[in-house]
From Swiss-Prot:
Main location group: cytoplasm
Protein name as annotated: tRNA-specific 2-thiouridylase MnmA
HAMAP family, A to Z: tRNA_thiouridyl_MnmA
Residues at the site labelled Interaction with tRNA: 131, 357
Keyword set includes ATP-binding: yes
Active site: 106, 206
Gene transcribed to yield this protein: mnmA
Amino acid sequence: MSSNTDPNGMKVVVGMSGGVDSSVTALLLKQQGFDVTGLFMKNWEDDDDDEYCSTRQDLVDVASVCDVIGIDLEVVNFSAEYKDRVFADFLREYEAGRTPNPDVLCNSEIKFRCFLDHAMALGADRIATGHYAQVREWANDGRSEYQLLKAEDGTKDQSYFLYRLNQAQLAKTLFPLGALYKRDVRRIAAEAGLHVAEKKDSTGICFIGERPFREFLMRYLPMRPGEIRNLDDGRVIGEHQGLMYHTIGQRKGLHIGGIKGRQDGAGEHDAWYVAGKDVKANVLYAVQGHEHPALLKTRLSATDLHWIAGRDPHTHWVYTAKPRYRTPDMPCEIEALVDGGAEIVFAEPQWALTPGQSVVVYESKVCLGGGVIA
């Protein structure tokens, strides 16, 4: 916690989702002496009566937790902002044949922009969320600078999803769970009598929830069947129902098992994987074998760059990067920074680099920022 976060008289608004992480966040801040208010954000309302929508139960859980902790609860609807700033981009990316990560945009545009602005209007000094990450304030050339650091619990670290935050946002943000492990968070919740102590963590994209992804996407984007071709020789080996349903490295759902990858039958029992898309021709390309060269690349181009410190990192400097969440940090160099883009070269081949996903760059535990894989 930064040196300028003396709890005496400081008002903190906590973004609460109904889960154990945000609940313990509010509890810890209250115990530390902050003036805490809980805030529940409703960011999606197209499916209020849908069997997959948990918003109503989540709000009930938040209200119960706030009652136990003894804090006030505010409810705000950001559904219009979410559709305009996050969901519209999500659909555009899928139409363009890419695989977006809406959680990154949701954080920068909704949770740390709309929510932050709303909290400040309520008179807050800081906001807090249940993200597993850390903020560090340090003096750089006589001025304060804020760094985003990985969480102590490496299995739960969420800095990857927060790489688009800026200095102003980090300066107003607290991450009380950054130094804790998940097991400790659940223990704290149980000891405090919070009924969400063992509540299952939410999974999947926030507005899709647990519903089948294809079923959800079909409501907004029309199916457009086309050919599946073998990338190696161009042969038609199947049919897809829409490029948007497939991502690079995908194995399941191609329905082309048993087809020989090569005319000579070599490797005919290897699984097929998505290796590329031709959006204009509506063709999906597949290759046979997990280690096929088309799935292994040492270089990527990134666009829409954002650097947390507000300045470019060094080129030809050894960093690490995550080309997707849940992958280990991989040694890399930023080879060039040109026209708002970057060329990133990894020390070892990376499997299934996916256009639309984020590549996030680190220097040790410090998240420097990143961009979108082109």
